[in-house]
């Protein structure tokens, strides 16, 4: 579920978040069945498909709304995320700058942001930024792709 978290404005809009005025991060809330995929595996995918070493930036997108952050739901997720950060910190040339914070209020993004890649595959950002990440995921996690 696409959305926003970690800011200090109630019911933020994409327009306000994207301008950096709410302190929210653009996030994805993942609902998962641990019998199918573990939280640890989700964390591995997280490290695979984005750059956790650049502060407040993902590709050409710059600002705190693009920060690398893991919002955890409970102490077990926090411990697993801490262990994952420690493990993956040896895999990158630069230090991991990903924040690890308790989940504040999650605000669901506008309808047009849900399933954005699926609904807009020809859009420039989707074809040049998202598509290569999806292909990298599919190549690494073939068994998870339906």
Report the location of each language-model feature.
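Flexible coil/turn and secondary-structure edge motifs
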Residues: 1-146
């Amino acid at each position: 579920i696409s959305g926003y978290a970690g800011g200090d404005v109630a019911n933020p809009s994409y327009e306000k978040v994207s301008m950096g005025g709410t302190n929210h991060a653009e996030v994805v809330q993942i609902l998962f069945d641990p019998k199918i995929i573990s939280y640890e595996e989700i964390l591995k995918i997280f490290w695979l498909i984005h750059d956790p070493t650049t502060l407040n930036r993902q590709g050409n997108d710059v600002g705190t709304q693009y920060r690398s952050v893991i919002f955890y739901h409970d102490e077990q997720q926090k411990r697993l995320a801490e262990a994952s950060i420690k493990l993956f910190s040896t895999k990158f040339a630069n230090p991991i700058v990903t924040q690890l914070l308790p989940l504040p209020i999650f605000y669901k993004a506008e309808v047009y942001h849900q399933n954005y890649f699926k609904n807009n595959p020809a859009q420039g950002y989707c074809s040049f930024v998202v598509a290569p990440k999806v292909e990298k995921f599919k190549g690494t996690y073939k068994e998870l792709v339906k």
